[in-house]
């Protein structure tokens, strides 16, 4: 029977000093026999997805203590990608994922905590905490802050989100008044941005991995139903502790739950719902932390057989996360995948003995449970607020239309191939990724002329100066994990291409990455990256590039001999940008770049460089 990890600091004569300090935090004699459960919160006033989390850690703490545990809360950092975007702040976004993972490890191991409740929400916070959970492999449960309500304005017939505000701002034909109206309407409440962007994608994937409660990814941040998720998480983590430490039940540990099959389930969900390409990066990173042999080839394999069953902004303007919830949330998509014979349903979760059991209970098309139906009727109130659980609005009906609704059956899928694809070729030998859900079918095969930019900044200037024409393939390089450093998101270049009317007339290829808000023929994560000697660094202005999504290929139409000669020349010059970039690369960023791997490895640290230390 495993001992509580916390016994290291709570038991024995020699730990009198440690116990004295524990007592100073409020612990009593009886508490030293209970599991100490860390609450990793990520409250910050910088991020709308986290601004409402301040008191939620203590909400969970009280429930943990009622259930027989001792709760100790700490905080991690959280970067807002939208606010950090378009300037050097974006250099820090992806590196913050590693800092968050380390922070959770540091706090949990330094204080010998027995389990963790991860209160996350936005882009790098959920992945960072997931990496830590799989690294530590002690009982864990995730509960996120929830999605924002979609914005509303009389100037648009559809719901708004952050991307709408960015696109309209770049449209030279839009009046200042229209831009101001979109700006004030796009992000009306607390919560993670309302489309299927990175934050919401990752929170949905924690459900598929089995590490979060049903509704975690889709219940609105403002809705009173979300409070119950936090309360249930507090009770559940104590139960998981009892099963592991009291009954030696290792099936409750993160690596037992989030195994190879669970990672396949998560990736199949991502493909089926057209999630952010960033999720590929983060799943690969989490798999490495959990020592799961899941890689880009597995994602490529799955992308060829999973249909797209859900389409949400930015891939379609009609639906946002509140509509996914009304259609039954993530377990309705998982149910469709299960009935299609794809999902692994024999896996345990933190809340059910098996995924099959959970689907039977939570898929609205399979259950008559009125409480479940009521839960998924939770909807938006349309009232601007930064307060969690502040409204109890419900839809009159559910969206259970699997032919024409937000979530579809296999027979009525949006497309028979899913919303994400991995491409390989001489320009990306280790692969690159594209969100096909956001690509118009007319350009699934695209041959274009390379237009080279050595940074995101120069690409933005070129696009706005009309240097990019229809038929061009914008190449933005030296923006990978090592070359950026930090692998910036390219939402501004894609938004500006869209505002220039080039969304269906151009492509963009980069060793950087894309926001979950990106759509269009935007191909990222080109690996190896330019700074690591990748062939994207050998492309020249005027070269022809052929993109073929159906055949999963991307090739520079240059002979092998010519590429070899260019490589010799580039080796002599060094693999660095041809232009001087006015960005300040600090010691912190240099330290990140030193150990960073390319995107096909999840941009995690190169552990081989640390061997022997």
Curated annotation (Swiss-Prot):
Cofactor remark from the record: Binds 1 [2Fe-2S] cluster per subunit. This cluster acts as a Lewis acid cofactor.
Gene Ontology cellular component list: cytosol
Top-level taxon in the UniProt lineage: Bacteria
Gene3D superfamilies linked to this entry: IlvD/EDD C-terminal domain-like
One Pfam family in the UniProt entry: ILV_EDD_C
Gene Ontology biological process terms in this record: isoleucine biosynthetic process; L-valine biosynthetic process
UniProt binding sites for Mg(2+): 81, 123-124, 489
Enzymatic class: lyase
Binding, [2Fe-2S] cluster: 122, 193
SUPFAM superfamilies found in the cross-reference section: IlvD/EDD N-terminal domain-like, LeuD/IlvD-like
Signal peptide region: none
Pathway field: Amino-acid biosynthesis; L-isoleucine biosynthesis; L-isoleucine from 2-oxobutanoate: step 3/4; Amino-acid biosynthesis; L-valine biosynthesis; L-valine from pyruvate: step 3/4
InterPro entries: Dihydro-acid_dehy_C, DihydroxyA_deHydtase, DiOHA_6PGluconate_deHydtase_CS, ILV_EDD_C, ILV_EDD_N, IlvD/EDD_N
E.C. number(s) listed in UniProt: 4.2.1.9
Cofactor: [2Fe-2S] cluster; Mg(2+)
Function in brief: Functions in the biosynthesis of branched-chain amino acids. Catalyzes the dehydration of (2R,3R)-2,3-dihydroxy-3-methylpentanoate (2,3-dihydroxy-3-methylvalerate) into 2-oxo-3-methylpentanoate (2-oxo-3-methylvalerate) and of (2R)-2,3-dihydroxy-3-methylbutanoate (2,3-dihydroxyisovalerate) into 2-oxo-3-methylbutanoate (2-oxoisovalerate), the penultimate precursor to L-isoleucine and L-valine, respectively.
Annotated family: Belongs to the IlvD/Edd family.
Subunit structure: Homodimer.
The protein, known as: Dihydroxy-acid dehydratase
Organism for this UniProt entry: Pseudomonas putida (strain ATCC 47054 / DSM 6125 / CFBP 8728 / NCIMB 11950 / KT2440)
Name of encoding gene: ilvD
């Amino acid at each position: 029977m495993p001992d509580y990890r916390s016994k290291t600091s709570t038991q024995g004569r020699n730990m009198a000093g440690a116990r004295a300090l524990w007592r100073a935090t409020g612990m009593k004699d009886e508490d030293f026999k209970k599991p100490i459960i860390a609450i990793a919160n990520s409250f910050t006033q910088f991020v709308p997805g986290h601004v409402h989390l301040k008191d939620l850690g203590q909400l969970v703490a009280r429930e943990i203590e009622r259930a027989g545990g001792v709760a100790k809360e700490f905080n991690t950092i959280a970067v807002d990608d939208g606010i950090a975007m378009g300037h050097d702040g974006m250099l820090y976004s992806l590196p913050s994922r590693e800092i968050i993972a380390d922070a959770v490890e540091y706090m949990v191991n330094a204080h010998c905590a027995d389990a963790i409740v991860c209160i996350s929400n936005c882009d790098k916070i959920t992945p960072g905490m997931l990496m830590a959970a799989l690294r530590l492999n002690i009982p864990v449960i995730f509960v996120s802050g929830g999605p924002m309500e979609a914005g509303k304005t009389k100037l648009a017939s559809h719901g708004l989100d952050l991307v709408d505000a960015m696109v309209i701002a770049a449209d030279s034909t839009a009046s200042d008044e229209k831009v101001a109206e979109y700006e004030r309407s796009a992000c009306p409440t607390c919560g993670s941005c309302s489309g299927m962007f990175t934050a919401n994608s990752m929170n949905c994937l924690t459900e598929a991995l089995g590490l979060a409660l049903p509704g975690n990814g889709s219940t609105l941040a403002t809705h009173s139903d979300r409070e119950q998720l936090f309360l249930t998480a507090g009770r559940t983590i104590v139960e998981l502790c009892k099963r592991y430490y009291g009954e030696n039940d290792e099936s409750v540990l993160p690596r037992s739950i989030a195994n190879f099959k669970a990672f396949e389930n998560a990736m199949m969900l991502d493909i089926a719902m057209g999630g952010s390409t960033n999720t590929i990066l983060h799943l690969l990173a989490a798999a490495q932390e959990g020592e799961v042999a899941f890689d880009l080839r597995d994602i490529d394999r799955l992308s060829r057989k999973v249909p797209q069953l859900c389409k949400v902004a930015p891939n379609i303007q009609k639906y946002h996360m509140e509509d996914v919830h009304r259609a039954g949330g993530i377990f309705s998509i998982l149910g469709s995948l299960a009935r299609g014979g794809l999902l692994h349903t024999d896996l345990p979760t933190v809340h059910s003995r098996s995924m099959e059991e959970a689907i039977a209970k939570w898929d609205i098309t399979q259950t008559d449970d009125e409480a479940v139906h009521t839960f998924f009727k939770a909807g938006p109130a349309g009232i601007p607020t930064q307060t969690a659980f502040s409204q109890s609005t419900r839809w009159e009906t559910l969206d259970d239309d699997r032919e024409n609704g937000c979530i579809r059956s296999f027979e009525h899928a949006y497309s028979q191939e899913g919303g994400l694809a991995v491409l390989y070729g001489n320009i990306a030998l280790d692969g690159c990724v594209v969100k096909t859900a956001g690509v118009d079918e007319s350009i699934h095969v695209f041959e274009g002329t390379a237009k080279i930019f050595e940074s995101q900044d120069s690409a933005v200037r070129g696009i706005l100066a009309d240097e990019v024409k229809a038929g061009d393939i914008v190449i933005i390089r030296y923006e990978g994990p090592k070359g950026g450093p930090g692998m910036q998101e390219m939402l501004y270049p894609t938004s500006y291409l869209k505002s220039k009317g080039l969304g269906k007339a151009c492509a963009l290829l980069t060793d950087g990455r894309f926001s979950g808000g990106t759509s269009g023929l935007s191909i990222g994560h080109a690996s190896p990256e330019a700074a690591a000697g990748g062939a994207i660094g050998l492309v020249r202005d005027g070269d022809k590039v052929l993109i073929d999504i159906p055949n999963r290929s991307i090739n520079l139409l240059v002979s092998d001999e010519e590429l070899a000669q260019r490589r010799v020349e580039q080796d002599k010059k060094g693999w660095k940008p041809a232009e001087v970039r006015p960005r300040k690369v600090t010691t912190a960023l240099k330290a990140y770049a030193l150990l960073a791997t390319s995107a096909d490895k999840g941009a995690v640290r190169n552990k081989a460089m640390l061997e022997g230390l």
